[in-house]
């Protein structure tokens, strides 16, 4: 069944390519929304397809490399802290670090130490994006998307390699936090995501963008479907094997980006001649001035501001899920390898969901039943409700499967929000889409810097209280997401866009 779904997704991409080739021959039956900016019609359909497939392939490869390393790295943290804990308490374990039984490492002191490492790593990982997202966004708007993506991918690979080197040498685990310095190359995952989304927005029209975002997110989920079982199998032999494999795969992802066409030239046809590389006039060329201008542009549009602020839900939910392997292992008595398999099952459900939703988007697009912006807003609101419910159930449920299922059903939130945000922004700011996404990356990084230590603290408090209190971080995350949800509910599209439109026959 999985191969049939992938084949269907590929046919959808081919359909997009044929549509792009035909744009110059047939006028659209429905005009674009007022002020909307579409990519130049001179861009061939094959080039569009090449950009989409290479973005998906490179991102998928990178995510596989990162995912393969995730579970064994936590296991290495546990083993090192476990060995130090028993040695400190006068009862050193008579086995090498890699052979320490996992059951010996579930004390609250050891688990609190692991949570502290993860929580503060989130803080340090967010700092490069906060200070470098705008400069790299400006670079992507002037020199191109591909150079920035190459730096991002290289920085992430080096960051992973440093953390594993610290574990291999058995240096103090706090030195793993230095891995964030390598993310100054490119700005880290937040900037990589922003530039990838800007790359897609360069070449994909407004009415097709959310469909492609859904299909790309579904494709990337293959990393969880494939990498977690692979990691679990390899961990049964040795925790180091999947770690070395993961670094190699991340390096391969960086090499794949060399073949990515530069999309900035395709988008320049829609740029006003008096705009500078990141939407700032010549009299306001400084980084501070450009950052202030981007924030003013966001705040001046109530809808854009509401969408950007609602993206903080992603940081809260993502940081809480960073503890999922540790949480499931601690609360439900699973091994780290078994917990990683649970993430694969979650990815299978999310993969199917995104393909189904993507197919529905293609149907509404072809039938003209719903305006793309109204459709994206509806999907975002429904997905948000499922995220809040899933986190709440995860904090209270005696079994993990129902909570993961409900949470996963909210997977459409990010692609719907980003598609709607790009559409609204390009209607009035066509010249600096990369800087918009970079500004969003800064906001998300700040959210991660705040929510990461908060979720870590809640988890450690839950561990100290014992029993059902270990679910405290997910209860808090659910409440925070519910509060942010009110902002998304306040977003109102212009009156003329709220009426569904049909194609004339």
Swiss-Prot record:
Keyword entries, A-Z: Membrane, Transmembrane, Transmembrane helix, Transport
Membrane topology value: Multi-pass membrane protein
GO CC annotations on file: membrane
Compartment(s) of residence: Membrane
Highest taxon listed in the record's lineage: Eukaryota
Gene Ontology terms: biological process: transmembrane transport
Main location: membrane
Transmembrane helix keyword on record: yes
Disruption-associated phenotype: Does not alter the yield of aspercryptin significantly.
Induction line: Expression is positively regulated by the aspercryptin cluser-specific transcription factor atnN.
PANTHER family: FI18259P1-RELATED (PTHR23507:SF1), ZGC:174356 (PTHR23507)
Purpose: MFS efflux pump; part of the gene cluster that mediates the biosynthesis of aspercryptins, linear lipopeptides built from six amino acids including 2 highly unusual and nonproteogenic amino acids, 2-amino-octanoic acid (2aoa) and 2-amino-dodecanol (2adol).
Homology family: Belongs to the major facilitator superfamily.
Name by which UniProt lists this protein: MFS efflux pump atnC
Organism this protein belongs to: Emericella nidulans (strain FGSC A4 / ATCC 38163 / CBS 112.46 / NRRL 194 / M139)
Upper classification of the organism: Eukaryota, Fungi, Dikarya, Ascomycota, Pezizomycotina
Gene: atnC
């Amino acid at each position: 069944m999985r191969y049939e779904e992938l084949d269907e997704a590929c046919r959808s991409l081919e359909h997009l390519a044929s549509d792009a080739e035909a744009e110059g021959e047939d006028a659209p039956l429905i005009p674009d929304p007022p002020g909307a900016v579409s990519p130049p019609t001179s861009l061939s359909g094959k080039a569009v397809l090449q950009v989409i497939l290479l973005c998906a392939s490179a991102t998928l490869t990178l995510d596989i490399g990162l995912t393969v390393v995730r579970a064994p790295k936590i296991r290495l943290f546990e083993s090192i802290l476990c060995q130090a804990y028993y040695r400190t308490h006068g009862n050193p374990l008579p086995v090498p670090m890699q052979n320490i039984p996992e059951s010996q490492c579930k004390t609250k002191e050891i688990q609190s130490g692991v949570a502290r490492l993860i929580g503060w790593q989130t803080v340090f990982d967010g700092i490069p994006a906060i200070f470098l997202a705008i400069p790299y966004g400006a670079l992507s708007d002037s020199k191109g998307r591909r150079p920035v993506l190459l730096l991002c991918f290289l920085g992430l690979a080096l960051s992973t390699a440093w953390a594993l080197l610290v574990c291999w040498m058995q240096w103090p685990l706090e030195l793993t936090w230095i891995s964030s310095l390598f993310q100054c190359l490119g700005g880290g995952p937040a900037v990589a995501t922003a530039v990838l989304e800007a790359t897609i927005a360069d070449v994909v029209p407004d009415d097709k963008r959310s469909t492609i975002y859904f299909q790309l997110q579904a494709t990337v989920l293959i990393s969880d479907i494939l990498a977690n079982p692979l990691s679990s199998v390899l961990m049964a032999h040795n925790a180091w094997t999947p770690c070395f494999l993961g670094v190699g795969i991340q390096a391969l992802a960086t090499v794949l980006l060399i073949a990515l066409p530069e999309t900035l030239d395709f988008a320049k046809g829609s740029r006003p001649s008096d705009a500078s590389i990141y939407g700032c006039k010549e009299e306001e060329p400084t980084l501070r001035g450009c950052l202030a201008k981007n924030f003013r542009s966001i705040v001046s549009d109530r809808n854009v501001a509401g969408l950007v602020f609602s993206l903080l839900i992603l940081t809260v939910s993502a940081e809480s899920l960073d503890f999922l392997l540790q949480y499931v292992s601690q609360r439900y008595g699973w091994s780290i390898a078994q917990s990683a398999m649970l993430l694969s099952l979650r990815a299978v459900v999310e993969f199917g969901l995104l393909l189904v939703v993507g197919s529905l988007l293609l149907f509404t697009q072809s039938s003209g039943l719903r305006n793309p912006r109204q459709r994206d807003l509806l999907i975002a609101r429904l997905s948000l409700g499922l995220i809040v419910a899933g986190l709440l159930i995860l904090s209270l449920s005696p079994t993990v499967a129902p909570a993961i299922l409900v949470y996963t059903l909210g997977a459409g939130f990010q692609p719907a929000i980003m598609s709607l945000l790009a559409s609204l922004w390009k209607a009035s700011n066509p010249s600096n889409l990369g800087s918009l996404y970079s500004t969003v990356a800064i906001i998300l990084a700040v959210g991660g810097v705040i929510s990461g230590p908060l979720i870590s603290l809640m988890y450690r408090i839950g561990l100290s209280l014992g029993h059902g209190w270990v679910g405290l971080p997910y209860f808090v995350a659910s409440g925070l997401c519910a509060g942010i949800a009110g902002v998304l509910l306040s977003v109102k599209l212009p009156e003329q866009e709220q009426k569904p439109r049909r194609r004339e026959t």
